[in-house]
Amino acid sequence: MKPFRCNPEKNDALKDARGLSFESVVVAVESGGLLDIVNHPNQAKYPKQRVLVVAIENYAYLVPFVDEEDHYFLKTVIPSRKATRDHLHKGESDVNT
C-alpha cells in the first residue's frame, strides 16, 4: 500500500475541531479498520477523489482522498452516522422505528 500524506495545517484544524487526526485514520486503516473505499458522491466537482470508510472507536468516518502516483493524499475526516449504521451496525434494529 502507498503511504498516506496530508496537509499539516488541516491535520491541526481537525485535532482542534473534531479531536481526531489523520494519524489516527492511518493507524485505524493499518490495523484493519478500513471498511470500504467508494467513489466520491460528487464526481462532477471532485473527479479524482475517492472516499475511505474507516472505523475508529466503533464509529465510521468518511475520509476523502486523492490517489496520487506515489501516495494517497488525505483531504479531511468526516464523522458519518449513515456509514456507522450501514457498516458497523448491520442487522441491528433501530429503536426509533
Go through the PLM ranges and name each one.
Residues M1-T97:
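Ribonuclease/tRNase effector modules and their secretory precursors
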